[in-house]
Amino acid sequence: MYSALAALVLALLLTSCSQPDGRIAKSAHQLLEQGKLQQAQESLQDGFRQFPQSIALRQERLHLNLLAGQPELAAAEAQQILQTQPSAQPYRLPLRDPSPAIRSLAIRAFALAPPQHPSPLSVLRTALRDPDPTVRRESIEATRILTPTQATPLLRQATQDSDWLTRASAARLLGNRADPSAIPALFSMLQDKDSYVRRFARRSLLELSTLAKPDAYLPALQSKDRTTQVVAALALARLNDGRGLDILLAEMANPLGIERIECVKSAVRIQDPRVLPAVRAATSDQDSQVRMVALIALGLLQDKESAPLMKKIQSDASAPQEVRLAAGKALELLSQPTPK
């Protein structure tokens, strides 16, 4: 593909070389190919003094800006080209450049000020099939310029990408898109082999919970995977739905449960007589962070019966300082008037 591109570049240059600005552009292009960026820049500056509106020179300066890692300047150059010649395609060659770094930066520049032709959707769809993961990741980030209807299929496609960073980006952006229809795909990503991907899938699932109906999370409560169950229960609790409470309480009582802190925070949203005893028990958790959260939660719940426990923890010299401080704060909360 890239050998064909080289031939295309050569043909375009030969065609333009019949013009004086074309010859300067060709010379600058050769310098860029040789890595002589400073000399190429000087050549282009000389050319612009003679031909300030030259598209050929602007195209080479766009290339120079990409090589210099300055997509913002490249985007500005592309806009200048399009103002002079609206039918031009300033990104056609950069998007086919042999260098993945240039293709990636071209996508970034394209997204800063996307032209109408070719369509942004077609450009990003093609970039998502690029053999280099850097380019695919950049194309996923650039889906912000698309409508939700256009972006969601590309993001879901990226959840299956061979590159874990691309999958993680897709998981994060599915949450940012605020589209509850992505919930099933995100639940499947909780099984991803990479922890970074799983972390972003979890975060997006919880972010989407405020936009979704409980029914979107209920099937996951029946999953054989414990992580899937817990995340579904956390999401339901954010909707003040207690149908996952048993799972939250079990996770809080599990010394190896990695979601104990979040389960304490979520369980207190549910009006259920089993919650207070479970939160009280969490004040003796082996993890000081869990104990702190549980103490503050009891204070916020105005659990007067826990006052002796709080005082005991506050005066316990063997307890970590942050836990004693949390107990003191919980006692302060108990002394405050009960919200009506």
In which residue ranges do the predicted regions lie?
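Bacterial N-terminal signal peptides
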Residues: A6-T15
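N-terminal leader/linker segments that initiate helical-solenoid repeat arrays
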Residues: L14-Q89
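Amphipathic alpha-helical scaffolding segments comprising HEAT/armadillo-like alpha-solenoid repeats
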Residues: Q41-E42, Q53-Q59, E72-A75, Q83-L95, ...
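Alpha-solenoid helical repeat scaffolds
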Residues: A56-E60, P90-L93, R137-E141, R172, ...
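Alpha-solenoid HEAT/ARM repeat scaffold
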Residues: Q59, E72-A75, S104-R108, R137-E138, ...
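Core register positions within helices of long alpha-helical scaffolds
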Residues: L64, E77-Q80, A109-L112, A142-I145, ...
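Short inter-helical turns and helix N-cap capping residues of alpha-solenoid HEAT/ARM repeat scaffolds
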Residues: P98-S99, P131-D132, S162-D163, K193-D194, ...
